Amino acid sequence: MDKRQTIFFDVQELYYLPQYLPVYKELQKENVFDSKFIFHHGKFDDLIKKVIQDECLPANWVQDKNHALKFYLTEKPNWIFLGNTFPELNKIHIYSKTAQLGHGVGPKKSYYSKSDTPTTVRFVESDYRFKRLCEMYPEDNFQNVGFCKMDPIINGEENGIDFTKLGFDKNEKTILYAPTFYPSSIERFSKNFPADLENYNIIIKPHFFSMSKQKYLKQRELLHHWESFNNTYLAKVDDYSLLPYLKSADLMISDASSAIIEFAALNKPVLWCTFLQLRWNYRGIFSYRFKARMDKDYNDYGQIARPANSYNEMIKQAKNLLDSNFTLSNQANEYLKKLAGTLDGNASKRIVTFLLENC
């Protein structure tokens, strides 16, 4: 190879970063690639600049997807990593190869529809996902590499949270509430949620959109109310990675989030809230819209997590699970392998190996 290869990571949203970073750190071990993170301007630019500084990331900024497209066509990197669909890939593919690396393994149909606009390759997490995508898009290139986001935990590189810094008693058990933005359980929780679990530390790690988008203002109001309780920490927008909380928590409560799979894969108990706040046009005669949004994989959550069909049931089950000796069933492990693949800490290495072989 005559010159170093260039790889750009397109960071349209900050929460793409935990999926990219393990690959970037693996790339740094090779003397082949120059990497750069391309951030999109938005309301949290100052926060992102701090992340760039803390992680020592080589970075450029673009205004939006159209600006990013022009930038990529001008710079002509060898590879561009994307976390979602991207416009006019046919133009980009004249000069560059593209790789899609999704940020989660959740039950929404968007997991699969991201391949409606085919990249040069898409890295996927499990044999089941690989086979299904190959059936849906037989002309496209998929590589089953594993779930690289989890590599830092599996490899012992993730230290977890600082309990003292968060004002927590390390001797108390810790609950992680990690809801998604829609459909969400947030609005169905009691205003006294932290008081109902007063003997435990509670970390609330909402989706980035719940903390940033205007349409989820009511969610933020409730989240900030819960933050006022002494046993509760509300993750800030710059707490962009879920990994420290996955590492340190004893129990997760969630809803339609891929975090359920990530936490259960660590052989820890998960409560799956099936009581969701649906918009009026997703209820009653319009319930087909909710079903259309969620993939059939959503039904597998009941095999991995303990369903809670109401708020009161959730509180009761949370206490019971934290007071018991939990271990995942063999059946749950089979479903986890189906959705998240084998977690061996080597997914990032397999991605880099593919890149080395396809320079």
Protein language model annotation of sequence segments:
Residues 8-157:
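Active-site and donor-binding regions of nucleotide-sugar-utilizing enzymes
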Residues 258-339:
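Catalytic binding pocket for nucleotide-activated donors in carbohydrate/polymer assembly enzymes
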Residues 17-27, 31-36, 150-225, 235, ...:
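Conserved catalytic-core segment of nucleotide-activated headgroup transferases in glycan assembly
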Residues 58-65, 233-238, 303-314:
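Short acidic-hydrophobic, aromatic-tinged amphipathic segments that line or gate anion-handling sites
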Residues 1-7, 94-96, 169-173, 199-200:
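A short, charged/proline- and glycine-enriched loop
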Residues 50-54, 135, 221-230, 293-301:
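Short, conserved catalytic or adaptor-binding loops enriched in Gly and charged residues
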Residues 80-82, 89-100, 237-286:
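A donor-sugar binding/catalytic signature common to diverse glycosyltransferases
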Residues 343-359:
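C-terminal alpha-helical cap of glycosyltransferases
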